[in-house]
């Protein structure tokens, strides 16, 4: 009996958990700067955000997060938005609730709107006029991780983003990493115009193909963006290029010095060899310890070698050449 009781307790708790709405909502009271949680009810398979007669009149904001949108879809539970109540809020946060079109709540954007968070929904198209209104009013707007698609329907928005040239060019890489920041520094788009998660250059070509007929100016802007992107990419490589060029110059200088030294060495050796054998002089160097003395002999062939190693100032005697020997011989004859 105890096991059966425990089984039914777990079964009942599981069914109760599935019946409970998978949405957590809070309202914000600006007087004490506090968020208060309130329950969301399902009426006729429909959830209305914000809920009727649940939020006090002095609430300044609404925040709802759908924890299990798959559960709501499987059970055919739809979400409707009460735009008449939304107009009274300055802070609207509807996260992960499967919103497919921003126009569902755009009618509830009042002039006092100061914050809009629609992250993790299923937005595919953002109307140009709605986004322009949010940006002009300097409203912090978070639209990232949606499913915005390429195509003609988003051409006005695409053109608007390209016109944000100063900011857009600076954040071009981040744009393709699912983020773009507008000039008011408060509006962010993540995963904008996914195009099947195409890389940056393919995205430009793909989206431009759809929008060039309606906005011819896009072609010029895309070329500017591409050139700017390439310039920014190359700027990051400048230090490496400088280092590589410097290393190349040093290695070339080293090789040049080595080559110059080898050439000079070879040239000096060749010059020394020529001066030793082909100088044209007839003087034969003698060993200092042995000289010839011609004081007592008239003829060179009868000269006697004398040892002068003991004398400090021993004379160095000139040795006659072969021609001189021939002349002396002819004289003798």
UniProtKB/Swiss-Prot annotation:
Membrane topology classification: Single-pass type I membrane protein
Residue intervals annotated with topology Extracellular: 32-239
GO cellular component, one term: host cell Golgi membrane
Induction text: Expressed in the late phase of the viral replicative cycle.
Signal peptide limits: 1-31
UniProt note: domains: Contains putative leucine-rich repeats (LRR) and a C-terminus cysteine-rich capping motif similar to domain structure of host TLR3.
Task performed by this protein: Viral TLR3 homolog that probably prevents TLR3 dimerization and subsequent induction of IFN. Inhibits dsRNA-stimulated activation of NF-kB and IRF3.
Protein's recorded name: Transmembrane protein I329L
């Amino acid at each position: 009996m105890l096991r059966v009781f425990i089984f039914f307790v777990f079964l009942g708790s599981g069914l109760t958990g599935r019946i409970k709405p998978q949405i957590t909502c809070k309202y914000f009271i600006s007087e004490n700067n506090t968020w208060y949680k309130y329950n969301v009810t399902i009426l006729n398979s429909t959830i209305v955000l914000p809920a009727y007669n649940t939020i006090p009149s002095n609430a300044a904001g609404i925040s709802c997060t759908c924890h299990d949108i798959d559960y709501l879809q499987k059970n055919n539970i739809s979400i409707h938005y009460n735009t008449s109540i939304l107009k009274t809020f300055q802070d609207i946060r509807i996260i992960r609730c499967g919103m497919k079109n921003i126009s569902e709540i755009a009618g509830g954007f009042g002039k006092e709107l100061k914050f809009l968070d629609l992250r993790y929904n299923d937005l595919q198209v953002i109307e140009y006029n709605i986004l322009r209104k949010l940006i002009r009013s300097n409203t912090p707007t978070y639209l990232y991780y949606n499913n915005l698609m390429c195509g003609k329907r988003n051409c006005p928005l695409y053109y608007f983003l390209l016109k944000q040239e100063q900011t857009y060019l600076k954040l071009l890489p981040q744009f393709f990493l699912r983020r773009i920041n507008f000039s008011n520094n408060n509006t962010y788009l993540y995963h904008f115009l996914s195009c099947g998660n195409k890389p940056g250059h393919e995205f430009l070509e793909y989206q431009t193909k759809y929008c060039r007929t309606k906005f011819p100016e896009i072609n010029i802007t895309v070329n500017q963006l591409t050139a700017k992107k390439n310039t920014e990419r190359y700027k990051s490589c400048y230090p490496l290029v400088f280092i590589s060029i410097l290393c190349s110059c040093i290695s070339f200088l080293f090789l040049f010095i080595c080559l110059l030294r080898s050439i000079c060495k070879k040239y000096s050796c060749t010059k020394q060899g020529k001066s030793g054998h082909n100088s044209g002089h007839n003087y034969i160097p003698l060993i200092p310890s042995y000289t010839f003395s011609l004081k007592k002999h008239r003829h060179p062939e009868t000269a006697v070698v004398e040892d002068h190693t003991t004398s400090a100032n021993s004379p160095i005697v000139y040795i006659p050449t072969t021609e001189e020997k021939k002349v002396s011989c002819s004289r003798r004859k």
